[in-house]
């Protein structure tokens, strides 16, 4: 069997062939050690990156490069990367920025260098020093003067044409996915840009970045089922955080008037194209602001991110054009029900019996005896309207029953000063004016405990320490959480949340 430089790039090896290829590669590594050479050298000084060189020489012709070299102006470079193609006269390597060709001038290289080039397999990592040239086809290349094997790849790479066609294989072997899939690499580079862009925006708005506990003695800050663990030394249960909210608001009580945290939260719930048990979010709080101020801030943030990363406020998501240009649409929950719930009688929007009947018999949703008007309205909204909110839309006036941490509206205490932002039929952000009345908060915690006792695993616990902190005085404050994974999905046109998480949770493969 010929070596991989001319064979295993063009077909998918069988299991037997894979074992043969691994054995061949191991033999090559053994030869290096037997010759008294360092198998994994750690000394190579890279001076350049592929993308930087492509940009530096963009528009400079082959003739201009050669004339410059003839006049003593060779551009010397040192570059390193993974071998993606080896066709004898030309090698293609890939580094963190992209790909570039290497030119093999056989008459100018010594025997050791030629032997090394001949033995290269796809996936090997090499370092090259030489000078810049351009091929007759116009491709930029590095003319090899010195070449060093830095790391021997002992396993064959996925086929460059078929790649990792199986989606699950891509998730389980993200290192291979990134190695062979340019689209996947771009996705995670954009993810990095989104996070750094959010951080830059918040710092410019005078927010302070903070860190709060990942393990909580009492789960809180959101209505969700937590992961539970046990602290052996303290002999007490701990909960992976479902949200950092209650800790962040303690910081506002303490005098940090604008705080934010970008970190993971955990919810022991279902896995889908929109949900992962471990997810990344930014949560932030601003004193002397209300929920309307945060809607305005969110519009500015999304507009800035789109312009900085995409160069436009219009993007395409799943073949649908979405505009992130402000202002976003704003619609109350009941108005959304009126607009999207087919056959719904709006004259009975506050009639519990009618709401329960519609939810159960029209929408086929489970209705429990303890569900109030607000809970039923929320169910109907989620089932009839949520997925139809394609363009950015703030839904406001959420019921107090389903918003245990939000401030009641001054004119109608049955609703709260809260919003959720939907884009592409998915919730992207949730924010509200914060409840800062300790007596009202204690009452709502008691209601949540009653729901938990009635069998609702997602209802909140009573957090006495937080009530005590509120009693010292929380200034008028608004807070918001933005799901970064879903935002990245939007910016990268990803159909599944797993496409934008480097290592999504998967069932163990036996």
Swiss-Prot record:
Its main location: cytoplasm. Coiled coil: none annotated. Keywords: Aminoacyl-tRNA synthetase, ATP-binding, Cytoplasm, Ligase, Magnesium, Metal-binding, Nucleotide-binding, Protein biosynthesis. InterPro entries: Aa-tRNA-synt_II, aa-tRNA-synth_II, aa-tRNA-synth_II/BPL/LPL, Lys-tRNA-ligase_II, Lys-tRNA-ligase_II_N, Lys-tRNA-synth_II_C, NA-bd_OB-fold, NA-bd_OB_tRNA. CDD domains: LysRS_core, LysRS_N. Its EC number is 6.1.1.6. It comes from the Bacteria. GO terms for cellular component: cytosol. Belongs to the class-II aminoacyl-tRNA synthetase family. This is Lysine--tRNA ligase. The lineage of its organism: Bacteria, Pseudomonadati, Pseudomonadota, Gammaproteobacteria, Moraxellales. The gene is lysS.
